[in-house]
Amino acid sequence: RVFTKLRTVHPEPHLKRIANWVWVIVGLILSHSVHLSQIAQHIPSEAQAAGRIAQVRRWLSNKFIQVPDFYRPLITEALQGWAHQDVFVILDGCSVNHEALQFFRLSLSHCFRAIPLAWLVVKGPGLITVEKCEALLNEAAQLLRQVATVTFLADRGFRDKDWARKCRKLRWNYGIRVANNTGVTLADGRVLAVNTLGVKAGH
């Protein structure tokens, strides 16, 4: 059934690529793991474990396997259920290997779960800039063009005013967490900390 579903939503003409994709999905579900050694245990093959892992690696490194192109038709169909709805999207990130790599993901919030819309991998530590996430945000905006309103949520790691400016450009509302000592420049030129403005927590 997974194969049939993928064939109905994805234009990939090479059936072998679709079949390999299906078995990777099955491996993810049955193993409850993203580790290739665990996924490979659920791939039917006469090869030993190392051979099955190599098979998955070859599929992942195939130049014709572009993850966004494979994922986009699936998420586009899923998002039809949110047409004309008000939605919330969450940007979060994590790092691995002593911050050698940072992963950023923009997800649709739904029933205390996060449905991935777009993602980005960045080398090295440090705060991410909105310029580096431009493609990620634009991809999500394209996917969400049928919804009524979008509210962007992020923590204090994305507090730069450029993020707010980008949200306004996309016609998104936004709620970006900031530290209570963050300075705000008023119309008269004064710079005051947020905690001196009488703003209640959560507002």
Regions picked out by a protein language model, each given a short descriptive name:
Residues 121-203:
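An internal, acidic/charged active-site-proximal segment
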Residues 65-115:
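Structured nucleic-acid-interacting core domains from mobile-element enzymes and related host factors
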Residues 2-85:
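Electropositive nucleic-acid engagement tracts
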Residues 5-8, 18, 109-112, 123-127:
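Extended interaction regions within the primary functional domain
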Residues 39, 88-95, 106, 114, ...:
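Short, conserved catalytic/metal-binding motifs centered on acidic residues
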Residues 37, 73, 88-89, 131, ...:
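Short, contiguous clusters of charged residues that form electrostatic/catalytic patches at enzyme active sites
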